[in-house]
Amino acid sequence: MIRFERVSKMYNETKVVDSLHLEIKKGEFFVLIGPSGCGKTTTMKMINRLIETTEGTIFIDGKNIQDYNIDELRWDIGYVLQQIALFPHMTIAENIAIVPEMKKWDKEKIRKRVDELLNMVGLNPDVYRNRMPDELSGGQKQRVGVVRALAANPKIVLMDEPFSALDPLSREQLQKDIVKLQKKIQKTIVFVTHDMQEALTLGDRICVMRKGEIVQLDTPEGIIHNPANDFVEEFIGNRVRPWYEGKIIENVLPLVSGGQVENDASPLSIYASLQEALIRLEVEEAVPIERDGQYVGALTSRHIVTYLAAQMKERG
């Protein structure tokens, strides 16, 4: 879907992105994370040419992005900003309709699309269609920002720390909403964040960056199980470890139900440690869990990631 081949970006003599080689799969939720100045936002902005590459090539569906008409490229890539950036003197419907109007959709098609998108994020079109941005809460504005990016049905959506300016409750709700929304729309989403809990909650894969380079690219489970080096261990591992050290499988039990496991897989007790479960899950997709000899469910890496993300959020 999106492929970087030896992509670099320089400002004066400083390389802010250094020879990136990566591929983002169609329909995946791909998270870029790292400390401030690591190049994650620059990497994302090179996809829609808001920032031009210095070296290397980016391909979308096998085509060099330099071969696209730049306006059409950007119209076909949704973009959600941290600052939301709704036009204050336009109604909510008018804000959402900007790109469809640029693409010369007819008015009835636009009206139906606006109403469909508002319903998709829980905003009643009859109530919100003709409101002005200053009549909405921060969370409602960001919902509009998200659906505006989806208005022309792009294949790709870029999200630049879209929830970081929101209060904790709004942020948590929007994270849940975007997970549900992605299950429906199956877009290719590139999401920038500095928040590990957010990355664990949202990402199919997480790309950890440092000084313009990829340090580790893996699933949330893979990064938790096998941090690539001391930097990842410090940036992610040390943040996660306090939430599983000393914990037992029983702590995760509310998340576990049903599931299929290999017939010959030996069960773990609910009183076994999460560390023991993690070791098993390095080589097994699911581990059967038993209580007093009775099967209670199959534990997967995703159960543990969900538990750890919730613990990190709850305790900061």
Question: Model-found features: residue ranges?
Answer:
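A short, proline-enriched helix->beta-strand linker immediately N-terminal to the Walker B motif
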Residues: 151-155
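Helix-to-loop junction immediately C-terminal to a conserved catalytic motif
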Residues: 48
